[in-house]
Amino acid sequence: MRKTAVVAAGGTGGHLFPAQALAEALIARGWRIVLASDERVAGLAQDFPAERRIGLSAATYRPGDPVGMMRAGFAVLRGAMHARAAFREIGPDVVVGFGGYPSAPALVAAILDRRPTVIHEQNAVMGRTNRILAPHVRTVACAFPTLKKAPPKVAGRAVVVGNPVRPPIRALADVPYVPPEPNGPVRLLVTGGSQGARLLSELVPEAVKALPEDLRRRLTVHQQTRPESMNTARRAYRDALVDAEIAPFFRDIAGRLREAHLVVGRAGAGTVCEFAIAGKPSILVPLAIALDDDQGQNARLLADAGGAEVARENQLTVDTMANALEKLLTNPARLQRMAEAARSVAIPDAAERLADVVEQTARGR
């Protein structure tokens, strides 16, 4: 008889993409997948391989807002009651939470029903939902070797598995890095993430304009930008005489990552792990408003290994970005060293490792 896993994930790509990678790994092992989340997930989960989806009420709150906390608590309880009713019909063998407040109702229901439970934390800093629920679940898995803000007993038993990534990204682990020739073409990829892309959309094109002419003539840029920034970015690259592809979203991000000599991006957990797996040198710009500076802590994985430079928003200008780009793009030997350092901390088989943990938990081990 096929086993069933309920995968509960928040409605952003940072939570959903690793959840999907796990789902695909479990399906390959014969499991049936049920996705539990709120209505926000619909736009991102069109390709999620779930046989069934459960929409659950959930809400978040701002720290220091007791009324908001009460409302969020009632919403989670309503969602948990709905989940318990669904679980009686589905009979899941395990419930796996990936963080974000929409994951809470399914996990609360599983905890109340004493069902096997797993939490996966994508960031180097444990998120608020996972932090609250982790002491009550059977198994905690994490992506990074350090897990800040976790209760001490939780951090001590967390299993490091890495961040599950989509198969096209996983395939890049076997592709060697080839640095640019001294006078040859140079390819720069600029990613944005779901939050805070405006800064990179506007600053990087201006920084490229400030590069020496001989470097600009060899440069090709692929950049994700917000729709409202596309015309400004195109104009800047056109003025700089730089060949550039500008789009809000690249469906074949793996292909562009494969060809890039250097990547500039935020430091979301998935982004950092993807750069490591692909073995790409990077300039990381942690989102300044990220809760608990989780992006800054994520960036340390690559920076401490020597695979990335970190540029803090409060110190970032057109000139500092231009200087960082020039120093790296004109130094192939350093790019090669950074690529090797980035790949040294990668865990490309994270989806399989997490699937092993899920199966062990379901068996009661």
Swiss-Prot record:
Sorted UniProt keywords: Cell cycle, Cell division, Cell inner membrane, Cell membrane, Cell shape, Cell wall biogenesis/degradation, Glycosyltransferase, Membrane, Peptidoglycan synthesis, Transferase
Record carries keyword Protein biosynthesis: no
Pathway: Cell wall biogenesis; peptidoglycan biosynthesis
Disulfide bridge partners, by residue number: none
Gene Ontology CC terms: plasma membrane
A molecular-function term among this protein's GO annotations: undecaprenyldiphospho-muramoylpentapeptide beta-N-acetylglucosaminyltransferase activity
Presence of keyword Transcription: no
GO biological process: carbohydrate metabolic process; cell division; cell wall organization; lipid glycosylation; peptidoglycan biosynthetic process; regulation of cell shape
CDD domains linked: GT28_MurG
Ligand binding (UDP-N-acetyl-alpha-D-glucosamine): 12-14, 123, 166, 194, 295
Main subcellular location: membrane
Cross-referenced InterPro entries: GlcNAc_MurG (IPR006009), Glyco_trans_28_C (IPR007235), GlycoTrans_28_N (IPR004276)
Enzyme class at the top of the EC tree: transferase
Subcellular location(s) per record: Cell inner membrane
Highest taxon above the source species: Bacteria
EC number: 2.4.1.227
Annotated membrane topology: Peripheral membrane protein
Catalysed reactions, semicolon-separated: di-trans,octa-cis-undecaprenyl diphospho-N-acetyl-alpha-D-muramoyl-L-alanyl-D-glutamyl-meso-2,6-diaminopimeloyl-D-alanyl-D-alanine + UDP-N-acetyl-alpha-D-glucosamine = di-trans,octa-cis-undecaprenyl diphospho-[N-acetyl-alpha-D-glucosaminyl-(1->4)]-N-acetyl-alpha-D-muramoyl-L-alanyl-D-glutamyl-meso-2,6-diaminopimeloyl-D-alanyl-D-alanine + UDP + H(+)
Record family assignment: Belongs to the glycosyltransferase 28 family. MurG subfamily.
Role summary: Cell wall formation. Catalyzes the transfer of a GlcNAc subunit on undecaprenyl-pyrophosphoryl-MurNAc-pentapeptide (lipid intermediate I) to form undecaprenyl-pyrophosphoryl-MurNAc-(pentapeptide)GlcNAc (lipid intermediate II).
NCBIfam families for the chain: murG
Protein name, entry field: UDP-N-acetylglucosamine--N-acetylmuramyl-(pentapeptide) pyrophosphoryl-undecaprenol N-acetylglucosamine transferase
